[in-house]
A protein has these predicted regions:
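Active-site-proximal region of nucleotide-activated glycan assembly enzymes
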Residues: 1-62
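Structural detector of well-ordered beta-strand residues that form the stable sheet scaffold
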Residues: 1-5, 22, 102, 154, ...
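Glycine-rich, histidine-containing beta strand-loop boundary motifs that form or position
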Residues: 6-8, 105, 162, 178
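Short, glycine-/Ser/Thr-/acidic-enriched flexible segments
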Residues: 11, 26-28, 47-48, 77-80, ...
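Alpha-helix C-terminal capping/helix-to-coil transition sites in glycosyltransferase folds
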Residues: 17, 145-148
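Conserved catalytic-core segment of nucleotide-activated headgroup transferases in glycan assembly
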Residues: 46-138
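Short acidic active-site motifs
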Residues: 140-142, 163
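Catalytic binding pocket for nucleotide-activated donors in carbohydrate/polymer assembly enzymes
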Residues: 147, 151, 155-187
Length: 187
């Protein structure tokens, strides 16, 4: 049998038993092939796919128009929001007056994780009133929540995948810091 790795782990498996990794010319360029045990199988345009949600959700107006401030957002797994990400995003919030950061992920239903995020941003000079923190919700409600943010922020070095597709689907542009490896080129 032929074994192929794809979405879910965006690096070499390190296993000679895995024959291929699916990629594209952007996420794994020719010079990086030697970093993979697997043979790189490049799709011509994009390595991933996204299916249209089964919900009829309208893309809303830019929230900054009515809010009179910019709302950045990230609905990625909290493990992707490391100290370097928090430091950079805090710098962004400080440079744009009245701006807010909306984080949404299931861990934020738990006070421990919510308080941890608040404290990490506070240590970078960001007060709690600049943060909007929400836990999980059904997918339809999650997609509607994109109508509350102006610009999505992509974490690094582990960028978003499905989260970025959802943001684009809902008409919200994404601010990305391109990395050098597959895992940090998905934004």
């Amino acid at each position: 049998p032929i074994q192929i790795t794809w979405t879910g782990y965006l690096d070499t498996t390190g296993l000679k038993e895995i024959d291929y990794i699916i990629a594209d010319p952007f996420v794994v360029d020719k010079e990086q092939e030697n970093l993979f045990v697997e043979k790189v199988w490049r799709l011509p345009d994009i390595w991933n796919s996204f299916s249209q949600p089964n919900y009829n959700i309208k893309v809303g107006m830019l929230p900054a128009i009515s809010n009179k401030f910019v709302t950045f957002g990230s609905f990625n797994h909290l493990n992707k929001i490391n100290n370097s990400v928090i430091k950079l995003w805090s710098t962004l919030l400080k440079k744009i007056p009245k701006s807010k950061l909306f984080l949404k992920y299931k861990s934020l239903n738990i006070d421990y994780y919510k308080n941890s995020i608040v404290n990490k941003f506070y240590n970078c000079g960001i007060h709690q009133d600049q943060l909007i923190l929400e836990g999980s919700s059904p997918r339809e409600d999650l997609l509607k929540t994109y109508n509350r943010i102006d610009i999505s922020l992509d974490p690094f070095p582990y960028s978003g995948g499905t989260t970025n597709f959802e943001s684009i689907w809902m008409g919200v542009p994404i601010l990305v810091l391109k990395g050098k490896k597959f895992i940090s080129k998905c934004g």
